[in-house]
């Protein structure tokens, strides 16, 4: 048996009005990173209201963009170097959290200073970035996505408060929620999976499966929102330790070229990846297929054998995503079929080199990845 480690990550503060705990933290200079909506909508004031304006100096950077870029990150660097914060507060979805991580890594490298305290306040339930040592940054010039992986990127404190998720639109709720499920299912079968990561993934799968439809139908359902927030962090703990797989690798490459929502891309790819990892076209499934069948059993699907269990899980995922208007085709991603096919060889090359690929349970070739892309292109 190989030697493994398991890291839980940040200090978690969660529950109703968890944001109020900000006032009890030792903060002198806070650099708040968010997108323009968080600033214009007043959502950022939920943070400012709990920072003692008499003793805490604050500065807001609201230049976060979806799928953060090298260019957007660079806009903050001169500002943060002059401000010299002792705390960085990341307020937003995965893009804000990933931006904050890239900012903090760049800032500490340039200034040769100790890392400021990083406080993550997620406003969507999906990326799990509030727990992980990962960040994904795009380069618009090269049309590539880069995965940053460093233990210093794990936030010091994560504040989970549903007040920030109540106004998230249904489509974003669905996309980010399906990203949670993708994280769970990839971590559950990843090479680095363990009893510890499995426990987090299993709980998160059940929470997301039960509560995502409820949060989608009624954004004011506080219980469903809270459970999805918890599921997202549990999934993050799981994949931060176990790893991910080719669903994310394939997704990163598509996102780099076509800029579709990350969670939506994962949603349409996931059934194909499960089938591939299980060798579903063969008479019997792989050991990985047995793991997927265990998930199907957890979700109370009826089946006679493991192959049927995998098929039921795939069918269940398609039915779940259909509730959110996601049919599982390129149309869901707003991508032209001929344009997609033209980019398949290069996307497969990038996916093969992606940081998520090594943890996939079934080892892949470029041809394997191209085959999955072509299967998606043929879907109607």
Task: Identify the meaning behind each predicted range.
Residues 16, 22, 40-43, 70-73, ...:
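Short glycine/serine/threonine-rich phosphate/pyrophosphate-binding segments
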Residues 339-380:
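Short, amphipathic C-terminal "tail helix"
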Residues 108-195, 286-294:
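A glycine/threonine-rich phosphate-anchoring loop and its flanking beta-alpha core
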Residues 80-123:
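A short, small-residue-rich loop immediately preceding and capping a beta-strand
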Residues 174-234, 238:
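C-terminal and late-domain segments of enzyme folds
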Residues 1-87, 330-331:
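ATP/NTP phosphate-donor binding region
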Residues 257-260, 264-339:
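Gly/Pro-rich interdomain helix-loop hinge
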């Amino acid at each position: 048996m190989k030697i493994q480690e398991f890291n839980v990550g940040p200090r978690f503060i969660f529950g109703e009005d968890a944001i109020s705990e900000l006032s009890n933290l030792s903060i002198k200079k806070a650099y708040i990173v968010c997108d323009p909506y968080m600033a214009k909508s007043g959502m950022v004031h939920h943070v400012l209201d709990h920072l003692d304006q008499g003793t805490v100096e604050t500065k807001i950077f609201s230049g976060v963009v979806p799928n953060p870029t090298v260019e957007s990150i660079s806009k903050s660097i001169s500002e943060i170097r002059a401000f010299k914060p002792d705390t960085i507060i990341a307020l937003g979805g995965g893009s804000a959290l990933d931006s904050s991580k890239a900012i903090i890594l760049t800032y500490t490298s340039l200034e040769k200073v100790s890392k400021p305290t990083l406080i993550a306040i997620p406003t969507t339930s999906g990326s799990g970035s509030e727990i992980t040592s990962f960040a994904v940054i795009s380069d618009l010039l090269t049309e590539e996505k880069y995965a940053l992986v460093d233990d210093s990127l794990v936030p010091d404190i994560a504040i989970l408060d549903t007040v920030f998720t109540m106004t998230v639109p249904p489509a974003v709720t669905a996309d980010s929620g399906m990203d949670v499920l993708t994280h769970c299912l990839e971590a559950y079968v990843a090479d680095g999976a363990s009893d510890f990561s499995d426990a987090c993934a299993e709980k998160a799968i059940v929470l997301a499966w039960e509560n995502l439809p409820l949060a989608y139908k009624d954004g004011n359902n506080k219980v469903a929102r809270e459970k999805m927030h918890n599921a997202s962090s549990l999934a993050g703990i799981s994949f931060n330790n176990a790893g991910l797989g080719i669903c994310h690798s394939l997704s990163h490459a598509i996102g780099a070229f076509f800029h579709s929502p990350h969670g939506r891309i994962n949603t349409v790819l996931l059934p194909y990846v499960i089938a591939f990892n299980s060798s579903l076209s063969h008479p019997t499934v792989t050991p990985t297929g047995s793991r997927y069948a265990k998930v199907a059993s957890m979700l109370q699907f009826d089946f006679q054998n493991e192959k049927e269990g995998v098929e039921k899980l795939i069918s269940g995922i398609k039915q779940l995503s259909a509730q959110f208007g996601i049919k599982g085709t390129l149309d869901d991603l707003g991508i032209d079929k001929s344009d997609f096919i033209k980019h398949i060889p290069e996307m497969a090359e990038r996916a093969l080199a992606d940081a998520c690929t090594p943890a996939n349970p079934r080892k892949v070739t470029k041809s394997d990845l191209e085959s999955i892309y072509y299967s998606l292109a043929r879907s109607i």
